[in-house]
Amino acid sequence: MNLQRYWGEIPISSSQTNRSSFDLLPREFRLVEVHDPPLHQPSANKPKPPTMLDIPSEPCSLTIHTIQLIQHNRRLRNLIATAQAQNQQQTEGVKTEESEPLPSCPGSPPLPDDLLPLDCKNPNAPFQIRHSDPESDFYRGKGEPVTELSWHSCRQLLYQAVATILAHAGFDCANESVLETLTDVAHEYCLKFTKLLRFAVDREARLGQTPFPDVMEQVFHEVGIGSVLSLQKFWQHRIKDYHSYMLQISKQLSEEYERIVNPEKATEDAKPVKIKEEPVSDITFPVSEELEADLASGDQSLPMGVLGAQSERFPSNLEVEASPQASSAEVNASPLWNLAHVKMEPQESEEGNVSGHGVLGSDVFEEPMSGMSEAGIPQSPDDSDSSYGSHSTDSLMGSSPVFNQRCKKRMRKI
């Protein structure tokens, strides 16, 4: 029996048994994977190096510790924001579910061994110039040959360096395509730098001179870096100073979080320190009997010890910083403290006054009176105008005409 055939129908072989249309369909339907168009990169045609390094790297410990501090500060800011939100809800009276207690302040990342103080360990200063001895084998070009890195190793190191730079700049995460693109940019920059350096060295060998002190200085100016000292400034400001700044920020954030978590402790620390105040008594200078006899006879002498030494003029319980004197050197330099015994003749108007004092002439002082400053005269503890020595009317300092009268009569020295 001949069956009617249609156009395009596949003939059935005699060896193939009759099967239904369901048997002809595939048993498992597979989804077609949709791929994004590949990003065009200069290094796309080269084999992609693995992420793991096949060579040991020596990262800068200062940079790595700065990155750890940045991550630590980010965690502290998140904890502070969470604690402040909980305190604000409690202040507003909003009923919230029982939340977990705030965790304790996380510890700061420890300093590396080469950044410890000098008394702990001798630090290895980064960028330390080694093998600078002209007599060394390294300086003469002798010793082990220089290790040559393959393209894959250089690519791995450059990839890791770019990731470190981004982390040091404050980025928390980055796409792999971004890292690959920035690695290509850094690769092209290094190629440009090395080509200019090769050209400058050949030009110096051909002409025998260079317009710059060194070919490296010339290439630095050509690529836009500037002087070689710019690298030192960058290291000082962007690496070392930035590390010190992050240490300070970490300390401030830790203290702030402790004040939020333990407000009672912060209140106790904020209490003012009470200082015990001791009463200050006036110091009187006793007048010797010989001085009283001289005053009674009409002759006055001003011994060196009348005003007293500095240790006698101030009580023992007062500190030197509380003294109104500027310093001991200024006290000793004043002509009043170095007077020798001066015998004075009484004035005609004061002959009858036994307690009156004579007047010192201008020839008594080797230096003019204008050279004395008010800082050289000790003031009273209660900021009064009277003398520091005594508040009585019989005080030599209070009524002596040395401080309130001009010279009227010429004296003679003993």
UniProtKB/Swiss-Prot annotation:
The modification Phosphoserine is found at S108, S323, S334. Residues 87-108, 346-414 are annotated as: Disordered. It is found in: Nucleus. Sumoylated. The keyword Transcription regulation applies. One of its GO terms (biological process) is regulation of RNA splicing. One of its GO terms (cellular component) is SAGA complex. This is STAGA complex 65 subunit gamma. The lineage of its organism: Eukaryota, Metazoa, Chordata, Craniata, Vertebrata. The gene is SUPT7L.
